[in-house]
Amino acid sequence: MNQSGRCQCGNVNYYFDKEKVISAHHCHCKDCQRTTGCGKATILYIASKNIKVDGKLKFFDSKGSSGMTIRRGFCENCGSGVLSYAKELPLLKFVKAGTLEDSSWVKVDSVFFTKSANQWDCLLYTSPSPRDISGSRMPSSA
């Protein structure tokens, strides 16, 4: 596995091959804004079978803007959000790109929930820009 990431304190670590990443996205939904404390979450879609997690995650469940139950996994010790998934889609993990040891290779494919994006959250995209998926919903499949 050629990529790794971790929580702030290092109690939770994860590993995957970047070739196994399905896609990457900026999500501007209110739930992601609240859990990140900023204007968006940058997430990588990875099949659950392609990621290995060492350490114990604690999960908080809430109804997401998509209408699905989102299970948000975070470190019990430092509180860093590491990954999440929709309870209705357990075979797909959403890894927080900011927890990667090296995120320089990440290329964002699309943007979700732009209708709830804040004007103060500048969009610093390089060409080509990620495509905006409808502005109000997350795609139903990866």
Task: Describe the predicted segments one by one.
Residues 125-142:
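Single conserved hydrophobic/aromatic residue that forms the stacking wall/gate
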